[in-house]
Amino acid sequence: MPGGRNSTVITKFILVGFSDFPKLKLVLFVIFLGSYLSTVVWNLGLIILIRIDPYLHTPMYFFLSNLSFLDFCYISSTTPKMLSGFFQKSKSISFVGCTMQYFIFSSLGLSECCLLAAMAYDRYAAICNPLLYTAIMSPSLCVHMVVGAYSTGLLGSLIQLCAILQLHFCGPNIINHFFCDLPQLLVLSCSETFPLQVLKFVIAVIFGVASVIVILISYGYIIGTILNISSVEGRSKAFNTCASHLTAVTLFFGSGLFVYMRPSSNSSQGYDKMASVFYTVVIPMLNPLIYSLRNKEIKDALQRCKNKCFSQCHC
């Protein structure tokens, strides 16, 4: 009965995952396992490289190391459980485990929204105010911005968690997804979900749209500054500095807004699942490559690291 408790109270859920593709089970498992291991190695490797190379101890790479940390935690909050489900007969997850998985996942996602906005401001300061960059982006400000991103993400997720715990689940307990995400929980709830739908929309606007606005304003100033640079080489260097961040922002917010700015419905769950694969698995794997492949400073740091290891091995 909507809005009230039923005689049956759900204490666990069944995560369908990708069991509707039995013939592709092994192939999908190998793909997702490879993606997960690659993401872990690339993101942790980037964090270690930034940590050990003194030339990368700048605000830009401080933010990048935190982005890599978030991406590592982000994919680890969903993928291991999804991988274990490929070969488990019982694909169940407790109600507490389900809500905690969403809380962790949501906290990381919201924190990443804020961090990407902070990174855009850092690029604005570097390109539009190069002479004052060191003074503007002081170590204390960088730390405060990162701590603020984490804290704000935790707060936004905690508000959602409190609302989710007010829901009653008394009907079907099958989640047609590979992790516990809010749209799927709303579909299964036998309570009135409109208030939480509104909350979901408000959170998406505050974190998603507000972060995008900050990013757009920052890049508006950046583009204006780049157009005023006389040399082609200077323009190219400034643009390349921002291109990787713009790519990451487009991928992250594009896929996230596709899922979370739409009403929940059973008919859209197949699309949600595919979009979720993109922003929970693919994007965390691509981010370290996006920021590294055309980055001369990262390549130089890798070369210095190789030379140092080579010299130590031959001592």
Curated annotation (Swiss-Prot):
Subcellular locations according to the entry: Cell membrane
Predominant place of localization: membrane
Membrane topology, from the record: Multi-pass membrane protein
Superkingdom, natural source: Eukaryota
Cytoplasmic side: 51-54, 121-123, 166-202, 262-272
Keyword Cell membrane attached: yes
Cystine connections: 98-180
Effect of a null allele: Mice show stongly reduced sensitivity to muscone.
GO biological process: G protein-coupled receptor signaling pathway; sensory perception of smell
Gene Ontology MF terms in the entry: G protein-coupled receptor activity; olfactory receptor activity
Function as written in the Swiss-Prot or TrEMBL entry: Odorant receptor specific for muscone. Muscone-binding causes a conformation change that triggers signaling via G(s)-class of G alpha protein GNAL, activating adenylyl cyclase.
PANTHER family in alphabetical order: OLFACTORY RECEPTOR (PTHR48018)
Family under the similarity heading: Belongs to the G-protein coupled receptor 1 family.
Protein name from the UniProt record: Olfactory receptor 5AN6
Source organism of the structure: Mus musculus
Gene name for this UniProt entry: Or5an6
